Regions:
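A long, amphipathic alpha-helix that forms part
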Residues: 2, 169-195, 205-249, 321-336, ...
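Active-site nucleophile/metal-coordination loop of metallo-enzymes that catalyze phosphate/sulfate
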Residues: 2-6, 14-148, 294-297, 301-310, ...
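Secreted, luminal/periplasmic, and some membrane-associated catalytic domains
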Residues: 2-3, 12, 21, 73-103, ...
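Beta-strand elements within well-structured catalytic alpha/beta cores of enzymes
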Residues: 4-21, 35, 59, 100, ...
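Short secondary-structure boundary/capping segments
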Residues: 24-27, 124-126, 211-216, 262-271, ...
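Acidic, His- and aromatic-enriched active-site or binding-groove loops in soluble protein domains
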Residues: 68, 124-152, 216-221, 267-284
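Amphipathic alpha-helical blocks
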Residues: 114, 178-187, 361, 374, ...
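Low-complexity, glycine/alanine/valine/leucine- and proline-rich hydrophobic stretches
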Residues: 380-430
Length: 441
């Protein structure tokens, strides 16, 4: 057998290990079922928090959020109180594409989150969903004009999904077909060393249609299966297309489950006296009153309004800070949903979760000024609860058009022709395995 020295990666955003097993047992995915007998198929874990931008940044860098610098879809500037969407230019670690490029490998990447703005690679980089104009989202730049002319679409319009589910489903199908068309087009152009395509449409499908599938509700239960039949056809075509010298890696970045309630943590902080606003409703983070003790960013990231760190901080580092963190954690764990179930499974100290060493080896001596993007507390919800971070909502619990939400567990990993250590159990540990495949760079 020919030695495999090239790698094809297909990422299905948010596709659960358990879902693939169910669909295979139902006969929906015969190509994938055949494929798993030829390789290794197992559960994969995400990172905390299990968000696409955070998890794929970890995949690309082999680092935890505290190391690569992305801890959510939204970050804060503690000096100005501005909130902003972090992009690839804020990564603190060199991404896999650049490492491979510097070693002379030819690389291709399409639609992977946290690759916008595009950066120079030895090959082609097509940015993902933070990019609004494909003509400005590629390296080299002329690729963007080519994609635009071919009708390539970066992402489906989520606002359409809030108004018209049928129209949104049709959009998902259209975007998928354009993505796959371009994937096969570019793959045929040359012999790539590393070729990766990311499909965001599976994540979008789950957010809007999970209820219909899990409860077998017409008409979208069958459409959900229809979508995965098409995914299976794509997997089958990829398998047949790959030459003998190319290994195959399929994966997702997090799992999914039925969404019970959206939970608005800043509302909870207001109701419990920890968060005050200059005006109601608040229009921006700058409306957070200096007397506030804490605020939250999505999902479940809680920041103490700390003196010397936040612009208008009023909580002293030391005993006052430690006491407040402990009080918030204890109260959050008592929060119950309208159905009587506990919302919060765990509340972690940020430095513990991300491995930041405490001074003198004790949490009592942790310097919160060193945390950077790391939240003081990270609330981990029980499955089915989505901890929102908007400044204000008219109720603590809500149910909307979204019917699926992320999980830390139940992502999936399939690999054939590449060795992956059994110890590589989370998405951030795969980078090292890929680099080993390419000679231990």
């Amino acid at each position: 057998m020919e030695t495999k020295n090239r790698l094809f990666v297909l990422a299905l955003d948010g596709t659960p290990f358990s879902l693939l097993n169910q669909l295979m047992s139902e006969g929906i995915m015969p190509n994938f079922r055949q494929l798993v007998h030829k390789g290794d198929f197992r559960e994969l874990y995400s990172v905390q928090p299990p968000l696409s931008s955070v998890a794929w940044a970890s995949f690309m860098t082999g680092a935890k959020p505290a190391e690569h610098g992305i801890s959510g879809f939204v970050e804060r500037d503690p000096q100005t109180m501005d909130w902003f969407v972090p992009k690839a230019d804020r990564l603190k670690k060199k991404p896999l594409l650049q490492i491979l490029s510097e070693k002379g490998k030819r690389v291709f990447s399409m639609n992977v989150p946290l690759t916008y703005p595009p950066y120079k690679v030895n090959g082609i980089l097509i940015s993902g969903f933070l990019n609004k104009d494909i003509r400005k989202g590629t390296y080299p730049a002329p690729i963007g004009a080519f994609l635009k002319a071919k009708g390539y679409v970066i992402d489906a319009d989520v606002e359409t999904g809030k108004r018209d589910l049928q129209a949104f489903f049709e959009q998902l199908e259209f975007v998928l077909e354009k993505r796959v068309e371009m994937m096969f087009h570019f793959y045929q152009q040359e012999k790539w060393d590393f070729f990766m395509t990311h499909i965001m449409e599976t994540d979008r499908l789950h957010h809007f249609f999970w209820k219909y599938f899990s409860e077998d509700l017409p008409p979208f239960a069958e459409k959900f299966r229809q979508f995965y039949r098409r995914i299976d056809e794509i997997i089958g075509k990829v398998q047949r297309m790959l030459p003998d010298d190319t290994a195959l890696l399929l994966l997702s970045d997090h799992g999914f489950t039925r969404l019970k309630y959206e939970v608005y943590l800043n509302r909870w902080l207001v109701e419990n006296g920890y968060l005050l606003y200059e005006q109601m409703p608040p229009k921006s983070p700058k409306d957070i009153h200096p007397f506030s003790k804490a605020f939250s960013l999505y999902p479940g990231r809680i920041y103490i309004n700390l003196k010397g760190r936040e612009k208008n901080g009023n909580v002293n580092a030391g005993p006052e800070y430690e006491w407040l963190c402990e009080e918030l954690a204890n109260k959050l764990k008592t929060l119950r949903a309208p159905d009587g179930q506990p919302v919060i499974a765990q509340v972690h100290r940020g430095f513990e979760l991300y491995g930041i060493p405490a001074q003198a080896g004790s949490a009592l001596f942790i310097d919160p000024l060193r945390l950077g993007i790391v939240p003081d507390l990270l609330a981990i919800p029980n499955k089915g609860y989505d901890l929102k971070g908007v400044l204000w909502h008219d109720r603590l619990f809500d149910q909307t058009v979204f019917t699926g939400t992320h999980t830390f567990d139940d992502a999936f990993l399939f690999y054939q022709g590449i060795e992956i250590s059994p110890k590589a159990k989370s998405i951030d540990t795969l980078t090292r395995e890929i680099l080993k495949f390419f000679g231990g760079m």
